[in-house]
Swiss-Prot record:
Organism lineage string: Eukaryota, Viridiplantae, Streptophyta, Embryophyta, Tracheophyta
Ranges of compositional bias, category Basic and acidic residues: 479-501, 579-591
Coiled coil residues, start to end: 66-365, 541-590
Subcellular location: Cytoplasm, Cytoskeleton; Cytoplasm, Cytoskeleton, Phragmoplast; Cytoplasm, Cytoskeleton, Spindle
Natural source organism: Arabidopsis thaliana (Mouse-ear cress)
Region (Required for targeting to microtubules): 250-483
Cytoplasm found in the keyword field: yes
Biased composition (Polar residues): 400-425, 432-453, 594-605
A GO term from the CC aspect: cortical microtubule, transverse to long axis
GO biological process: cell wall organization; cytoskeleton organization; plant-type cell wall biogenesis; xylem and phloem pattern formation
Transmembrane segments: none
Keyword tags: Cell wall biogenesis/degradation, Coiled coil, Cytoplasm, Cytoskeleton, Microtubule
Subunit structure: Interacts with MAP70.5 and itself.
The protein's name: Microtubule-associated protein 70-1
Length: 622
């Protein structure tokens, strides 16, 4: 694996093997936050002195696949998914538009049928009006016949009063045929009234039948609308089933991809373990440079503070010398000096506050480190549960191995964790110069093998860099204090013997980079396993939902078939009823026509008889 620099970059082989005494500081090392506030206007960051082309070549060598390409591929896949969703939404919109058009057509058909029914109602109303007019005409004829009868009786009375001779025939002989005719006319009038009543009853029954037919038509239309709705729902359910099947296929594909990614990650973890063994020495050298730089910054801060104190004391001495020859009223401190002393005291107060904040952050970082190492222990217990235990030889008096750092030291495994649990801090073992050069040359050999398969590890590497920067918003340069003591084994031994564990530097960034990366990769593997299990469970749930939807569709189709059969039966019964009503109407019309012809013949006979009677009367009077 590649060596991490202070700004998140990588070191070449020549730069990693250079001795410690470098005239220029490490490239692009930024000043710490507390020092930057005071000396930002006085000092600028040092320009890099290493070759940028060599760094770029080394980066391209280590990275087999570009993370930008991976991200672009992921974005293209997301765009394709969004396009697919958009096409599905367009298809649903088209289906809804078609259903709306069908509903509009059904509404238009219903309006046409209602218009036809209105026309039929108007025809029946016109027939009723014509029947009422006929009844009025019959009543008027009846009144006219009664008036003619009364007039005939009056004429007969006058004739009877005018008769004086006894030779004329009796009045009873003349009145008898007239009374018979009157009885016949009255009986005919009664028959006509009965016919009129029967016609009224028939019209009312026909109106009731028409209303029933309208109701049945409305119910049939409502059932047809229900059938259309059921068909639309069936189509929607079929579409949902297709969508669920497509989602199931997509989830299967994603599951296969995740399984392949997990296999790739396991392979990259193995290769990273091999590369981590060679990258520890270069990382330790980088830590040494960073620690030296931070110590130089602290020395400069102390020198600045001493210079400020010297200025303040010099100003005070000057004021005392100047006030020796003055009176008591004139001995006043100058405003400029007072402002400078006030600024100096405020700076010291701010430094004390910064120290308090740093101590709080150190305490928080220690707590977070404890949590992190406990989590690492859990992860390692889960991963190494089935593996055989490996015995590790402990080197006395903190001496380093001659063949380079072991895997446990570079990864930050169980050995260092046991020492951390017992002492509260991690002991570091720095390699000798010869092992340092050999390990730095082995970085390139391992990097060539790992660059081809290192596809998905860039995100975890970025996370490792973020963790290395510290939980309390430390700058990366503050980590130089912890790595400064690994410059030589003698100084580390003396400091470890003289200082108690409480005075040693806080293990905010004591762990090497490879250990963090290994833990992150282990976490990602566990998370991927959990996500694959959850996806399997979600696939099972979706299969169950698809089965439920299929059952619902079957029940709906059966219900639709039953409703369609009922509708067909009802429509056939309605057609039969309409045919019977038409036959009844035809018979009624024929009966009406025959009844209309019969009274006309009877009235003709009555008029002929009346005319004959009148002619007989005139003859008798003559």
């Amino acid at each position: 694996m590649s060596d991490v620099s202070a700004d998140g970059g990588f070191l070449s082989a020549e730069q990693a093997t250079t001795p410690v005494a470098i005239p220029t500081p490490y490239p692009s090392l930024t000043v710490s936050a507390s020092y930057k506030e005071k000396s930002s206007g006085r000092r600028r960051p040092v320009r890099p002195s290493f070759d940028a082309a060599a760094d770029n070549e080394f980066i391209t060598l280590l990275h087999g696949s570009d993370p930008v390409k991976v991200e672009l591929n992921r974005l293209e896949n997301e765009v394709r998914d969004k396009d697919r969703e958009l096409s599905e939404a367009n298809a649903e919109i088209k289906a809804l538009r078609l259903s709306e058009r069908q509903r509009e057509k059904a509404c238009e058909e219903l309006t046409d049928e209602l218009a036809k029914l209105d026309g039929k109602l108007k025809l029946t109303e016109s027939l009723l009006q014509s029947k009422n007019l006929e009844i009025k005409k019959i009543n008027e004829e009846k009144k006219a016949s009664m008036a003619a009868q009364f007039a005939a009786e009056a004429t007969l009375r006058r004739v009877h009063a005018a008769q004086k001779d006894d030779d004329m025939p009796p009045i009873e002989a003349i009145l008898a045929p007239l009374e018979a005719e009157l009885k016949l006319a009255r009986s005919e009038i009664g028959k006509l009234q009965e016919d009129n009543r029967a016609l009224d009853r028939l019209t009312k029954s026909k109106e009731a039948a028409l209303l029933d037919a309208e109701r049945t038509v409305e119910t049939a239309l409502a059932k047809a609308a229900l059938v259309d709705d059921l068909q639309n729902k069936n189509q929607e359910l079929m579409k949902q089933i297709e969508i669920c099947q497509e989602e199931n296929k997509i989830l299967d594909r994603m599951h296969r991809q995740k399984v392949a990614e997990v296999e790739k990650l396991t392979q990259t973890v193995r290769e990273l373990e091999e590369a981590v063994l060679a990258g520890g020495a270069a990382a330790n050298a980088v830590r040494d440079y960073q620690r030296k730089f931070q110590e130089m910054n602290e020395e400069r801060k102390t020198l600045d503070r001493e210079l400020a104190r010297a200025k303040v004391t010099a100003n005070r001495v000057a004021t005392v010398v100047a006030n020796e020859w003055k009176d008591g009223n004139d001995k006043v401190m100058p405003v400029k000096q007072w402002l400078e002393e006030r600024r100096f005291l405020q700076g010291e107060m701010q430094q004390l506050r910064d120290k308090l904040a740093i101590s709080d952050r150190a305490a928080k970082s220690e707590a977070q480190l404890k949590d992190k190492f406990q989590l690492r222990l859990r992860v390692l217990e889960e991963t190494l549960r089935g593996t055989s235990s490996i015995s590790i030889r402990n080197t006395p008096e903190g001496r380093s191995m001659s063949n380079g750092p072991s895997r446990r030291q570079s990864i930050g495994g169980s050995d260092n964790l046991q020492k951390f649990a017992s002492n509260g801090f991690l002991s570091k073992k720095t390699p000798m110069r010869n092992s340092f050069t050999s390990n730095s040359t082995s970085v390139l050999k391992n990097a060539k093998g790992t660059s081809k398969s290192f596809d998905g590890g860039t995100r975890s590497l970025d996370r490792g860099k973020a963790l290395l920067k510290g939980p309390g918003n430390y700058s990366f340069n503050k980590a130089c204090d912890e790595t400064k003591e690994s410059e030589s084994p003698n100084t580390w031994k003396e400091d470890s013997e003289e200082k108690p564990p409480s005075e040693l530097p806080a293990p905010a960034t004591e762990d090497n980079v490879p250990g963090v990366l290994y833990d992150l990769l282990q976490k990602e593997v566990v998370a991927l396993r959990k996500s694959s299990h959850e996806k399997d469970q979600s696939l099972k749930d979706k299969d169950d939902a698809i089965e439920m939807l299929a059952k619902k569709v079957e029940t709906l189709t059966k219900a639709m078939e039953v409703e369609a059969k009922k509708m067909r039966r009802e429509v056939a019964a309605m057609e039969k009823e309409v045919a019977a009503m038409r036959v009844d109407k035809d018979q009624d019309n024929r009966a009406k026509r025959s009844s209309n012809t019969k009274p006309s013949s009877n009235t003709a006979q009555i008029l002929a008889a009346r005319a004959a009677g009148r002619s007989g009367l005139t003859r008798s009077t003559q």
